[in-house]
Amino acid sequence: MSDKTKGIIAATAAGAAVATAALTVPPVIMQRVACARGREFKLSDAFKSKDRKSKRSMLEVKRKVREIKQREYESVEIESYDGLKLKGKYFANPQKAKRLIICFHGYCSSDYHDFSYSFDYWFERGFDILLVTQRAHGESEGKYITFGIKERFDCKSWVEYAVKRFKKNVEILLEGVSMGATTVLMASSLKLPKNVKAIVADCGFISPFEILKHVMKKSYKLPAFPYLYLTSAASGLLAGFGFKDASTVDAVKRTDIPIFFAHGSSDGFVPCRMSIDAFDACASDKKLFIAGGADHALSYVVQKSDYERTLGEFLSKYIKNFKI
């Protein structure tokens, strides 16, 4: 082999190495940014929006958070299927109606923020309330957020904990907001106890791949290929899950649990069509509520009366003596 040939081969190899590094390093960074435990959502973040309706809605949420934080609760804990300690807050209802709602918050959000506004609605209807802190958030253990992929199994574990603690005659609802909605929808196809009577899914996305593809295109003008595919591969190596490992659309095709879908028509983070697609695919009894003009996770606040009425009419078919 001539020195010239060796030089060409060496240069080609060096070029390939640089190209590989250029394609590999950014996806690893992107995976860590998207999935690693990080900064928790703060209410002040919401006020960066220029939309007045959203700001007014967030002021109401902020007020409700202050109220709910004054209530007494029991700290509870379970162990996930992969050995993580997961935390929750259990609020016992004096009505003792044998009803429990288990609530799952969204991406980098918190239990108080996502469920403060609906807390009184459930409490007045006799529900004990279990606010779950999702893995890789708050006091719960976990290095990586998995956008519902692993959280769906955590959901199943929380249901099994509830049935064991509150006995077999307890009626259970599952509620999720944003990534929490994706969590409960993905869990809907698992073998859950019959105690789960219905699911409330507010502004969930279809899968990690679909929501990250949307964010990359909208915010960074980047195509899914090759970056998102490489980032998914990096996630498989670093966090043990790929962005296409599960989807809400696939899950609800195989569920028999009644599902109430809600979404704001003006959602600036998760496109409303993602709930519509999941609703269309759902094999069980279902209802879709679109809140006109509502931004992300604000459907309940923006159209409270219509939301509660539509939700109540749906749930009254599955929960005994449910107050509409």
Spans of features found by a protein language model:
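An N-terminal hydrophobic leader/cap segment in hydrolases
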Residues: 13-79
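Conserved alpha/beta-hydrolase
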Residues: 121-141
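Alpha/beta-hydrolase active-site loop
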Residues: 145-166
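Short alpha-helix in the alpha/beta-hydrolase fold that links the catalytic acid
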Residues: 248, 257, 271-280
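The serine-hydrolase catalytic nucleophile loop
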Residues: 107-121, 134
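Catalytic active-site module of serine/aspartate enzymes centered on a nucleophile-bearing elbow/loop
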Residues: 301-324
